[in-house]
UniProtKB/Swiss-Prot annotation:
Superkingdom of this protein's organism: Bacteria
Keyword flag Membrane: yes
UniProt EC number: 2.7.8.26
GO biological process, one term: cobalamin biosynthetic process
Its job: Joins adenosylcobinamide-GDP and alpha-ribazole to generate adenosylcobalamin (Ado-cobalamin). Also synthesizes adenosylcobalamin 5'-phosphate from adenosylcobinamide-GDP and alpha-ribazole 5'-phosphate.
Localization annotation: Cell inner membrane
Encoding gene, per UniProt annotation: cobS
Official protein name in the record: Adenosylcobinamide-GDP ribazoletransferase
GO cellular component: plasma membrane
Length: 244
């Protein structure tokens, strides 16, 4: 139960019981619950979308996006923005890249990337409602993205002392594969297009390894955001295919 509470606290801003003591090392155990927290996020997002869809797809999309950002506290968006600044300003210098990641200021690369990301999600959420992607797909989608983050932590951490280092090399593989099997079974039944999620996982992991040689907390957050958007795009496209 402690690790579940920590996972909810780490990945969301939802209220949870307060732990009397805390050890940063406990975060490593929380990683087994990432997919479950993703389902919780997805359920809240889909619920608000369902309410808004009674009036208009755009209203549903806006409610879902606002809920998504609020529930997560913009945690993963922050990672995406930091990574965009780092990649844009580092000029392939590892030292410069890490320095930019630690800089609390927001640069132009981050602003542009975050604006495009939010706009893409808003439009794709509207299209998902309009074309009947299905609320179950929206519930499952954040879980797939967060389970991907578990796999990305098999990469070496880029720097010592960050959240990513606490997760690296400390994997509960039985929990990972159980989560994968459950998500795969639900997706095969409710939203088959989401079974392509591991392809997006692999693409992001390959990018991190080839471009950066490892991962950081910002890399994990950015990957979650991009996986969510990628799966939204795939889900919308699937509704327009002849076999959909």
């Amino acid at each position: 139960m402690r690790s579940l509470i920590l996972a909810v606290q780490f990945l969301t801003r939802l209220p949870t019981p307060q732990l009397r003591t805390f050890d940063p090392a406990w975060l490593a155990g929380a990683i087994r619950w990432f997919a479950v927290v993703g389902l919780l996020v997805g359920a809240l997002v889909a619920a608000l979308g369902w309410l808004g869809a009674w009036l208009d797809p755009w209203l549903a999309a806006l409610l879902m996006l606002v809920t998504w950002v609020w529930v997560t506290g913009g945690l993963h968006l922050d990672g995406l923005g930091d990574l965009a600044d780092g990649l844009g300003a580092a000029h392939r210098s590892p030292e410069r890249f890490l320095a930019v990641l630690k800089d609390p200021h927001t640069g132009s690369f981050a602003v542009i990337t975050l604006a495009l990301q939010l706009l893409a999600k808003l439009v794709l959420l509207m299209l998902a409602v309009r074309h009947g992607v299905g609320w179950s797909a929206l519930v499952l989608l954040p879980a797939w993205a967060r389970l991907g983050a578990v796999w990305w932590t098999t990469l070496p951490p880029l720097s010592a002392g960050g959240h990513a280092e606490r997760f690296a090399w400390r994997h509960d593989w039985p929990a990972f594969w159980l989560s994968w099997l459950l998500l795969a079974a639900l997706s095969a039944w409710l939203a088959p297009v989401l079974l392509l999620a591991p392809v997006l996982w692999w693409g992001w992991r390959r990018f991190l390894w080839r471009r950066l040689g490892g991962m950081s907390g910002d890399c994990l957050g950015a990957g979650i955001e991009l996986t969510e958007t990628g799966l939204l795009l795939l889900a919308v496209v699937a509704t327009r295919l002849p076999l959909a």
